[in-house]
């Protein structure tokens, strides 16, 4: 695609950012400026957005790895302001294989949610409790 910038290549798959991804960066800068966030809050917000896009990229790699299992090449993965797209060379002809490729991305999301949920369940939140009247 003409409006993309190559970021890196992972497992032989080019990862690209669409020009519209710049809108996300502008949005982050706007929110930080608009709300006069502290440095800590600004860093936290930027990290939240980055983690979200890492999850999007992992989701797309889920589709790509499932397609690779059926010898279907992934041309590239493109991230934009609204999400990601794994561009596959072809679509599996057998419905069962197509379902596996289609469900691989959401399966990655479930795995991420499970890992994060287990971690959050294991940590203490006593420092986040509201003060109570004595």
Spans of features found by a protein language model:
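Short, charged/polar low-complexity linear motifs in solvent-exposed/disordered segments
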Residues: 33-35, 83, 94, 106
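Membrane helix-loop-helix hairpins that form the core translocation module of multi-pass transporters
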Residues: 100-125
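Conserved small/polar residues in nucleotide/adenosyl-binding loops
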Residues: 126-132
């Amino acid at each position: 695609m003409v409006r993309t910038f190559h970021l890196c290549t992972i497992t032989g798959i080019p990862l690209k950012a669409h020009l519209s991804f710049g809108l996300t960066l502008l949005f982050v800068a706007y929110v930080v400026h608009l709300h006069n966030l502290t440095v800590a809050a600004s860093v936290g917000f930027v990290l939240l957005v980055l983690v979200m896009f890492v999850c999007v990229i992992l989701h797309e790699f889920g589709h790509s790895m499932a397609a690779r299992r059926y010898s279907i090449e992934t041309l590239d993965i493109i991230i934009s302001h609204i999400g990601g797209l794994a561009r596959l060379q072809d679509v599996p002809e057998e419905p069962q294989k197509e379902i596996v490729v289609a469900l691989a991305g959401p399966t990655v999301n479930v795995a991420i949610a499970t890992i994060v949920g287990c971690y959050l369940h294991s940590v203490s939140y006593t420092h986040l409790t509201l003060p109570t009247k004595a």
